[in-house]
Each structure stands twice: as structure tokens, then as C-alpha cells.
Amino acid sequence: MKFSALLPVFFLLLVVGDEVQAIAKTALKVLPQLFKRSVVRKREIEEAFDLHQRDLDFDKLLSQLDFN
């Protein structure tokens, strides 16, 4: 009787173990790509802001030099 009760538990452990392994493999492939994309996006945003800030600083400098 114990064997018949343990058999479904053992089968479920195999199925769940395979699912966990598949999820872990997928996560190991997907997560680094997500982080890479976010870092790239962050750099792009920072570069765009820096260019915009430089333009603003240059315009401010020109307005200060304008004596009219």
C-alpha cells in the first residue's frame, strides 16, 4: 500500500523537477538579455540627455554673450 502511494508522488517529483529545470534553463538564457537591454537603454537615455544638456548649456552661453 505504501508503494502505490509513493508512486504518484515519485512521478510528480519527476515532472515537477523537469519543469523546474526547463524554467531555470529558460531564465538563464532570458535574464542576461534583459539586463543587457536595460543597460543599453539606460546608456542611450543618458547620452541623449547629455547631448540635450550640452545644447542647453551652449544656448545659455550664447545668450549670455549676446549683448543686444
Curated annotation (Swiss-Prot):
Subcellular location: Secreted
Signal peptide: 1-22
Chief location of this protein within or outside the cell: secreted
Pro-peptide positions on chain: 35-68
Expressing tissues: Expressed by the venom gland.
Function comment: Probable antimicrobial peptide. Shows low inhibitory activity against herpes simplex virus type 1 (HSV-1).
Name of the protein in its database record: Antimicrobial peptide Eval162
Organism field: Euscorpiops validus
